[in-house]
């Protein structure tokens, strides 16, 4: 697992032992970032299920202004900090150990891009999408990127959000939602 391009291009990221964290495959990550490449420079990013930190780190490497990484597990937070140090991107990042719903309930920040790549077997994805679309933490024109397995359905309609088409990559689907207002470019 590596940083694909930008300031930290080619840096190998540490990966976890065991299966509690499932990093996004490089080819999926490359496809994801090619879709949102023009939204990244200067953006504020939330990597809600941080895991290894690779999505937020890739965004920082490509010019995001800042990234917040949230994960409930201390070992994941430690791994994210190590990967930020390896890439020398830690100054523009914060790592927060918290349950995702607890974080969302007290979050007062606004973001331009939110990455959602939770454990597949749980209801975290639906719960986080529901909560994010209820509260005001995404700027107008901001993007939510949701990674999910084939066969796991997500709602098409959230008030104030437009869902673009799904992008399939093997057994994975990337789904993009854009908050209404601001830039209305199609994803």
Regions found by a protein language model. Name each.
Residues 1-187:
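Class I S-adenosyl-L-methionine-dependent methyltransferase catalytic core
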């Amino acid at each position: 697992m590596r940083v694909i391009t930008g300031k930290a291009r080619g840096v190998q990221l540490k990966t976890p032992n065991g299966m509690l964290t499932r990093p996004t495959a490089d080819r999926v990550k490359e496809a994801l970032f090619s879709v949102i490449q023009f939204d990244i420079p200067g953006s504020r990013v939330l990597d809600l299920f941080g895991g290894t930190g690779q999505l937020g780190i890739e965004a920082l490497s490509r010019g995001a202004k800042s990234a917040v990484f949230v994960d409930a597990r201390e070992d994941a937070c430690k791994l994210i900090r190590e990967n930020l140090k390896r890439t020398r991107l830690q100054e523009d990042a914060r790592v927060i150990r918290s349950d995702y719903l607890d974080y969302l309930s007290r979050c007062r920040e606004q973001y331009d891009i939110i990455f959602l790549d939770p454990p597949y077997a749980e209801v975290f994805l639906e719960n986080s999408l529901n909560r994010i679309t209820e509260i005001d933490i995404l700027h107008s024109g901001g993007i939510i990127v949701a990674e999910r397995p084939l066969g796991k359905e997500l709602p098409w309609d959230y008030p104030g959000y437009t869902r673009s088409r799904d992008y399939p990559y093997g057994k994975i689907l990337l789904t993009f939602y854009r908050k209404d207002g601001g830039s209305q470019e199609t994803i």
